[in-house]
Amino acid sequence: PKNINVIDGINAEQYLGTWYEIARLDHNFERGLDNVTAHYEKREDGGIKVTNRGYNRTDKEWNNAIGKAYFLEQPATDNTYLGKLKVSFFGPFYGAYNIIALDKEYYNYVMICGPDKEYLWILSRTPELTYPIKQHLVSQANQYGFATENLIYVNQNPDIPNYEAGQHVVNPKGLKKPKQ
């Protein structure tokens, strides 16, 4: 999107693995889903296999979407990438995946947007993200012009059947409860 810089120097290997969705702007393909995760693994063709998973509390079942992603530019001499990818879950149709904030030291959190300011996600390596970091990312998104007042804070509930959480982080005092 206009006036938003993507992160450069992405280490693709370090980016792989499971990410927990902390917050998102609403869109129909994730509506009503809790316990949302994105799992990234290397494909044989050099791309990334994307497995998105979320629990539909109304239907009481897990929904999965499997897709593929590719960096838009060739790697730099240090084998890192610009954080612009294309992602597809529906055949030849690709959407934008832009990494606009990242904990570059440890890859513990990331903020992603789509082709415009209607799509925004905050992801973490753990089911909870500390309040100061979450607040920093929301503030940054707000400065970029995203409608942060419309963010949905995802319920990462370990009581859902077949929920696989890695490390649990306790909610800090004063953190607002996720929308139900």
Label each region the model flagged:
Residues 1-180:
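A beta-rich soluble binding module of mature secreted/lumenal proteins
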